[in-house]
Swiss-Prot record:
Active site residues per record: S183, D382, H444
Disulfide bonds: none
Cited function: Protease with a carboxypeptidase B-like function involved in the C-terminal processing of the lysine and arginine residues from protein precursors. Promotes cell fusion and is involved in the programmed cell death.
Ranges of the Cytoplasmic topological domain: 538-616
Compartment(s) where it occurs, according to its Swiss-Prot or TrEMBL record: Golgi apparatus, trans-Golgi network membrane
Taxonomic lineage from the root: Eukaryota, Fungi, Dikarya, Ascomycota, Pezizomycotina
Protein name: Pheromone-processing carboxypeptidase KEX1
Entry GO terms, CC: membrane; trans-Golgi network
Organism domain of life: Eukaryota
Bilayer-spanning residue ranges: 517-537
Amino acid sequence: MAPRFSWSLATSWHALAILALWPASTLAGDKSAADYYVRELPGLPKNSPPIKMHAGHIEVTPETNGNLFFWHFQNNHIANRQRTVIWLNGGPGCSSEDGALMEVGPYRVTKDNALTLNNGTWNEFANLLFVDNPVGTGFSYVDTNSYIHGLNAMATQFITFLEKFFALFPEYQSDDLYIAGESYAGQHIPYIARAILDRNKSKSRAETWNLGGLLIGNGWISPQDQSSAYLKFSLERGLIEKGSDNAQQLQQMQRICDKEMSINPGHVDYPECESILNKILELTRVGSGDQECINMYDVRLRDSAPSCGMNWPPDLKYVGPYLRQPQVISALNLDKQRNTGWQECNSMVNANFRNQNATASISLLPDILKEVPILLFSGAEDLICNHVGTEELISNLAWNEGKGFEVTPGNWAPRRQWTFEGEVAGFWQEARNLTYVLFHNASHMVPFDYPRRSRDMLDRFMKVDISSIGGEPSDSRIDGEKGPDTSVGGAKNNTQQHEEETKQKLKEAQWLAYQRSGEVVLVIVIIAASVWGYFVWRQRRKGTAYSALQSDEAAGQSRTGLAAFHNRQSDRDLEAAAFDETTVDNIPLQESIGRGESKYSIGDDSDEEEGETNKT
């Protein structure tokens, strides 16, 4: 019976072990936050401040293998409250890694696949989340025949993405959430915002997402206003000479465009109107063989035809090779089997997404503005989504019981001059939850040109106040008024500071533990000494009694015996002779404690301290 019982016991323990491991093995196919951790990013400069990053794919449509790629950067500081900014680029079908590595992210790419720090990064006071949206864009992927066709489908998939993202990273779910982007993201962002607000209405308070605001730069929001602005902008800037044959030809094309928009108002795309932009680019060709045209993203520059700006900005030639490196693909936790190489813009996504019958996002703004503030900003040198169109959009828009920036009948909100570090940066204008910012001397990609100014704009919009964390603010003024301190110059990285404080507390706890260990050793030594002393005392009492029983003759020899007791070479009382009472007070208590303490390591002064984040 004994062997059978032993076998049963072993089997039982084995079964228990399997049961204990079953939940973990069941979930092994599901990713955790740790699976998305970016452990090392190739090309980082030496001694660069540490930034916690996560990246990878999140599945949004299992039936079509639709996965959205994200890249998340933790904030450098926490001022007032926790914030997260989602950044989206346009296209449709252009990767948000443009924004990550050429605009608002913490790094810029240089030659030789090296990274440098962006001194105007938007993750200074907010976590940054870049998403390649929609599926098929950038590092995102989907089955070839399953590209999405409309804005509502895009928004639905994005909500699925956010649900899964916050399940993986619940620490960010309660953040103030801002959605930012540029160009065609002017269609994506309002649709996503509306989907979030609709979702919130069906959720408990604990499950809602706190949508703090929207920021759209040089946005394609109102196709009608923007399509009418190509020619207006070109004439105002002298790209096309007023009254010329070219101007008359373009005016005829504009009439065709206007007629199409009147027949089908509210659509997103009008091919008849896009032909006006193409014609302007064609008419501006100069040089040998007409091989140069204006850059449609920055009219101060020229580019080779027919690109006319598609080769810009100059950092683009570094971004592609960097993102295609095997080491980078591995660092960003990309599925190597699904990765076909990063593309800035996917023409297949663009071709499938451009649905002429979709309703433009401008129609969503009035209702969104009832609940959420919106900031529109424009670089003054952009043609394709120029500031003239944005300003027309605002003038024609009715929201919150008013139209345009009219605050009272016949009285419009003033354009307030904005200066940044002693230079005129542009102007601010705001009314009834809508803000408009014009950046002088800036292109379609404002943060590329002015990273620190754009970050100052973001901080003002989010109502960041650095007074609680210290540092030197930048000199940013609107109509001469400085306002809250919004840009940091010398504050310590709060996330890093928290880790250092935790490390210090751990050292203190270790010291306390070692100190208590020393006290225990001291008590043990004292007890041992007491026991040893008692033992010696008993032996001496025995020796005294023994001597009293001896003959007078033996007693007469006691001095010799006493002398012999102190003589360690005597063999008269071997047990007593082994102990000298003069050594009782010389038990090395302090020496013992000292050696005990020397065995402990309570901290090394040479431990490296984490570097401070560059401040602006």
